[in-house]
Amino acid sequence: MRIGNEYAAKTLCKAVQACYNFSVYTEDGTNETTGRSYMENKLIRSKYFLYLTEFFAGMSVMAVELGASRLMAPYFSSSQIVWTVIIGVIMIAMAIGNVWGGKLADKSATPDKLYRRLIIAAIWIALIPFVGRYLIAGISLLLALFVTKNFLVWAALAACLVIFAFPCVLLGTVTPSLTRFTVDNLDDTGKTVGRLNALNTIGSIIGTFVPTFVTIPAVGTAATFLIFSGVLAAIGIAYFVFEKKKSVPGIVSVLLIAGLCFALPSYSFAFWQSDITLEDESIYNYLQVQDDAKRTTLSTNVLFGVQSVQVKGDALTGMYYDYALAAPCMAGMDGTDNENRSVMILGMGSGTYASYCTRYFPGASVQGAEIDKKIADIAKDYFGLPGSVTVAVEDGRAYLAASKEKFDVIMVDAYQDITIPFQLSSVEFFNEVQAHLKPNGVMVVNLNMTSAENGSINEYLCDTMAS
């Protein structure tokens, strides 16, 4: 009876293989249907295609990691906490993929399954920017009902696990599988594995630089995901085309990625808003400008807050920003003649403070340092930054270190999302600022928070300045 059942099972398996063009391999890599070993495949035997696969797999992992930070930044910021969550989740996923991939390689030595996994990973990655924004919003709203402490950490962790873990697990299976296919004998095992790791690392390096400096500033985060998912899909499809085998996931990936490309022009991070004047991305930030009858605002990496506000007409904002205009008065400047007077703004942003200084303290020289060139351009194009204001596109601290000029007022207003960069809140930095102040000069710092409690950030920062 048992023999009959085994025979029936094998017959059924062969029928399924015949219907769906599946290939089943034994542990030594022999196809049970054709009797051919995968080593008879010219594409596999040459190894160059395998090395190319390793290269693009490494590149895609880093592209996903960089893309993850940009996708999550508008919702959770791009702070060190969020970066830690992203890196940790992806490393855990890769480790799981390594273990699983090793077991799969030993159990069934077939390239078909590896390249099918690559195509599935490509499909998932292509969907991330379009589905991920809804998942992030949904996960955040759900956790807000239960989490009362460390919400940012838990929400970022949950979103990262749901969105990015699965494709990274699949990509983690690549190296163990390729090791099985590329190692011919024990004499060159070390050389072969070393070559695979080197190509993976080189791919990772390219996957780090290209998104940051090329694709994200040029075409955006969503298009970056599509580009690298397309590369992964192309590798998988190329294998099946060369092998003259059908691949349903391959067909799906082509149709999906092509369709999503047409959806790019209408893509928006802030899918719930319809009154956005400008939505753009730079090397440093996600940028959003909103303009209405009363005011113009700039948001960077934060969808539910603003970094700069400019009220239409000659009115002040009516917010705490306006208090910074007391600094020039404290330095002896007035509303008439301010020749030989100067104001330096570190973190100029949209130039709101610079515009007010030129309006209320005519004749004063107003300069600004802004690390993000696109923000400097936005200041001119959308916030009407006066042409008399000089803007240096570089880091504020680096600008001071290279300058010998002294100022009557130095405004420190540099922010990374919702936090003050640590390099602009140290004793060394404040000593640098003091060295660039004229006698009776004034430094004004935008803290963006208030607290009367002991041990608050205000208290610590004031102690740092005083030291």
Regions found by a protein language model. Name each.
Residues Y286-Q288:
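Short, surface-exposed charged micro-motifs
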Residues I3-G4, K10:
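Short linear segments in intrinsically disordered or otherwise low-structure-confidence regions
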Residues S308-A324:
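Class I SAM-dependent methyltransferase Rossmann-like catalytic core
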Residues V16-D280, D291-K294, V302-Q307, C329-S342, ...:
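Alpha-helical transmembrane segments of multi-pass membrane proteins
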Residues S388-T390:
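Short, conserved active-site loop motifs that form the nucleotide-linked donor/cofactor pocket
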Residues A63, D314-M319, E394, Q423-V427:
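Conserved phosphate-coordination/catalytic loops
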